[in-house]
């Protein structure tokens, strides 16, 4: 990529994607970025990893067996790379279907050709400082391989941080993600930065894993003119109702902030006429704006503020009663937004990753996906890969390896 001032007003005129900030990042600097590393719990005890005991082999088998170790391997892989980060704005729609301006980031190789686009649906975040347009996303390390990553913020972050995030509202979020792709592609073509190939990768973990499958559905079901080379989906809540129901059935939430965030996302994103104060404990409902909607706190900080993993400490009797009118309506919305309820079978090849030790998104989600899509072209990678956070880092490490192998195969020198 030749150096271009993408923030130049002449380029912004009639542009589909308006760049608001541009910088070149030396990825070696990330190892010294304490705040960035802290978001990945690098100061905490390494997450559980039983790769050796499970006999994990293949691309998902990093040589390290700790969160810090695999993070270091990812950073070492990318350390000689410089990336061009473009934060910007594009047009999409809001929860009412009305026009709105959303934000996101494009990460390009600072020099050399662009091979393909990777359209990334990001994992669950809570604070606005974690929004892709405000930070270097972990998936951005894949820029080392010559790919350009397109990473939307979603409604509720970046340019729309004052809005409630419609968490796991699949069709809307898939539309928002695709709208950024449609905005970025002509913009970069106009700037002389078109990729060498016109097929793309889709990628996402956790919330992003389910969202990236919804993006694939939106492309294939509606015959969008986008060629998908491969989809990488990891740790996704493909069955939202089942995922939420586990909080109620077991009376335990290892990731307690997910309870109010999922409830609010369904209510706001689906425009449900439900009084959340009847379902949430008063101290949560009264602090929902301050703790969640302010976007000032990370998920870990919100978990600390909530002070309990016991679901009945978070929800009222009505909220815990799956037969109540309120919860029944909530569950209907969750079913309607679950990708597994769609009358659709993925066409493009998919790599689906899920840790059997996942403590946030139950592994059963992946098993239900495997049962639902038994006739699809899906490669499943299940194993004891550690908890949800560890699974995320291992997933990105695995995608890196798969992309390297894909490149070798494309160049005719792939070896098994």
Model-identified regions with their sequence ranges:
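Gly/Ser-rich "nucleophile elbow"/oxyanion-hole loop immediately N-terminal to the catalytic nucleophile
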Residues: 108-114, 183-203, 223-226
């Amino acid at each position: 990529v030749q150096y271009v001032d993408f923030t130049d007003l002449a380029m912004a005129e009639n542009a589909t994607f308006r760049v608001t900030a541009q910088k070149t990042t030396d990825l070696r600097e990330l190892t010294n970025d304490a705040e960035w590393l802290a978001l990945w719990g690098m100061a905490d005890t390494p997450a559980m990893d039983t790769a050796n005991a499970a006999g994990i082999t293949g691309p998902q088998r990093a040589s390290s067996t700790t969160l810090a170790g695999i993070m270091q391997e990812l950073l070492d892989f990318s350390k000689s790379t410089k990336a061009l980060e473009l934060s910007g704005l594009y047009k999409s729609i809001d929860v009412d279907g009305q026009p709105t301006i959303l934000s996101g980031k494009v990460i390009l190789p600072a020099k050399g050709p662009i091979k393909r686009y990777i359209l990334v649906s990001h994992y669950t975040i809570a604070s606005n400082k974690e929004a892709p347009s405000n930070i270097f996303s972990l998936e951005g390390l894949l820029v080392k391989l010559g790919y350009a990553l397109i990473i939307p913020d979603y409604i509720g972050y970046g340019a729309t941080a004052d809005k409630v995030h419609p968490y796991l509202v699949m069709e809307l979020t898939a539309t928002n993600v695709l709208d950024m792709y449609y905005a970025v592609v002509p913009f970069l073509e106009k700037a002389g930065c078109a990729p060498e190939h016109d097929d793309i990768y889709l990628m996402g973990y956790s919330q992003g894993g389910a969202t990236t499958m919804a993006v694939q559905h939106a492309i294939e079901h509606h015959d969008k003119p986008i060629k998908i080379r491969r989809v990488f989906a990891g740790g996704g809540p493909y069955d939202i109702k089942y995922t939420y129901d586990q909080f109620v059935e077991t009376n335990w939430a290892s990731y307690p902030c997910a309870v109010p965030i999922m409830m609010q996302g369904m209510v706001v994103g689906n425009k449900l006429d439900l009084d959340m104060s009847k379902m949430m404990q008063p101290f949560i409902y009264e602090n929902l704006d301050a703790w969640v909607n302010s976007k000032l706190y990370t998920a870990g900080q919100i978990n600390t503020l909530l002070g309990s993993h016991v679901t009945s400490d978070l929800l009222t009797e009505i909220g815990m009663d799956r037969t109540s009118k309120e919860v029944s309506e909530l569950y209907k919305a969750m079913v309607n937004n679950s990708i597994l309820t769609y009358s659709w079978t993925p066409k493009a090849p998919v790599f689906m990753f899920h840790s059997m030790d996942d403590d946030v998104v139950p592994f059963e989600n992946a098993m239900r996906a495997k049962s639902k899509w038994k006739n699809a072209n899906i490669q499943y990678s299940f194993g004891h890969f550690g908890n949800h956070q560890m699974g995320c880092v291992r997933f990105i490490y695995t995608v890196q390896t798969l992309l390297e192998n894909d490149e070798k195969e494309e160049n005719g020198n792939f070896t098994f």
